[in-house]
């Protein structure tokens, strides 16, 4: 629902989900509905929002932690973004479980980012983000933490050609990941040429759709037909 000042409220419910999503530590019990809501409020040159989500998790697929089919889980999120001289945003998420699962009991995520388009040639867009992830058996505990800094740059060479790069550094593991991508748009075909490097052991934070999960360095060619 949208108010006249552009504030809005979202409510949702989900059912039948089982697999992990994003940074989920545990799978979802698909027999128990999920539900949540979000309140978003406009601020000067931006907006801020508060979110809540509830689900029942299941630890039966992980052998080294206590086994529970139904683990009530409460998720709290706070995020905001502003357009000033640069684009600025932050995202925080706190996950509280009612069962003791050791270091997987509670999670905390803190992310800050910024983006800016430089007036170079056709315009080069640069995005910087830093993410801290904490796992602990104490709520808001920071004993087991991981820190990753990411940068993404994109430059349009022409209307049909673009070059971009994704770079990640894991401060905890001390390793570096990158993926440089050139793509050309034909009438019905999109062609991608990718050069990448991944460390031999890639953490879950560094695994995503933008950075492939093959270890080592390599070149990949991908052709996509659009119909």
Where are these regions (language model features)?
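Signature for the C-terminal beta-barrel architecture of outer-membrane proteins
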Residues: 1-141
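Membrane-embedded beta-strand positions of outer-membrane beta-barrel proteins
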Residues: 11, 39, 50, 90-92, ...
């Amino acid at each position: 629902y949208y108010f006249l000042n552009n504030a809005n409220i979202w409510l949702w419910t989900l059912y039948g989900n089982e697999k992990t999503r994003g940074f989920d530590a545990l799978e979802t019990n698909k027999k128990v509905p999920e539900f949540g809501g979000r309140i978003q409020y406009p601020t000067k040159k931006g907006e801020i929002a508060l979110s809540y989500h509830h689900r029942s998790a299941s630890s039966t697929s992980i052998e080294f932690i206590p086994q529970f089919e139904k683990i009530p889980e409460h998720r709290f999120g706070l995020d905001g973004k502003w357009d000033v001289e640069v684009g600025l945003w932050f995202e925080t998420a706190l996950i509280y479980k009612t069962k003791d699962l050791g270091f997987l009991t509670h999670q905390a995520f803190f992310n800050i980012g910024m983006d800016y388009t430089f007036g170079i040639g056709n315009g080069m867009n640069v995005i910087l983000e830093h993410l801290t992830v904490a796992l602990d058996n104490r709520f808001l505990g920071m004993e087991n933490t991981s820190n990753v800094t990411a940068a993404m740059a994109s430059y349009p060479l022409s209307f049909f050609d673009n070059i971009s790069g994704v770079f990640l550094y894991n401060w905890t593991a001390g390793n570096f990941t990158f993926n440089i991508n050139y793509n050309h748009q034909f009438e019905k075909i999109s062609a991608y040429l990718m050069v990448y490097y991944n460390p031999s052991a890639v953490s879950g934070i560094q695994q995503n759709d933008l950075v492939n999960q093959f270890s080592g360095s390599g070149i990949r060619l991908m052709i996509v037909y659009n119909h």
